[in-house]
């Protein structure tokens, strides 16, 4: 483990292309065995090259820290709901990249933090149970620089117990620098009747964008706007085959009318092919309580061009 000045700053990074982010093979990664890592109030550190078994708690836990880089780590095998891969609390400027995370309750759980940059990781089989079960969840995160970019996420039915693949809860980006979920590959979800692909605006929030993601059989839904202001779903590809728990490909529906508004919504240039449990095409739904949805007629609902072959048969190459 290297405890040095952080080698990557979170803010000011340009967004790499999807092709660049998704060609990482992890083939040359080597790891040093370690017990769980926990730091509170330690700034300017790099945690690199560790193999950690999570056990009953987080594999890596960081709180009250500034400028942290977690890279090329292997974090596996949690035994309960507390065993997340990486837990962040009240942190600023954290980069998590090129990590392999497998069989934990949640991959990355960031709470009350800002500038959290999660990029080019591979994660397999989130075990939950709820309220965990995400590859990445932002809870009350805020400000610029919060990004989830170019990761590969896969849940295998019977080996996982996921909720949302990505969940953005009560979190706020800023104008010109939204919380960005871009160019991720997501495959597998269910059988949760509440979980699915990417949830924006979970109990409010502002300035969140999901773009250029590919989701194959992500669960009950593909991408959702559950409330919030300045929310965007653009240029995504979503496929869902009929299963007993499937519902809808993309929806906008304020599920929190008593506590959060829902307005200034864009859903545009998406390609969706999603079959509900009843066997009918159900690629989109407008719940009618988020105002006018910009771009709604510019999507390709029910297109056969989106199918399971848009992602490679072997997606997770790390071990």
Residue ranges, per PLM feature:
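N-terminal segments that cap or nucleate solenoid repeat domains
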Residues: 13-69
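Right-handed parallel beta-helix
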Residues: 43-54, 66-77, 92-103, 114-128, ...
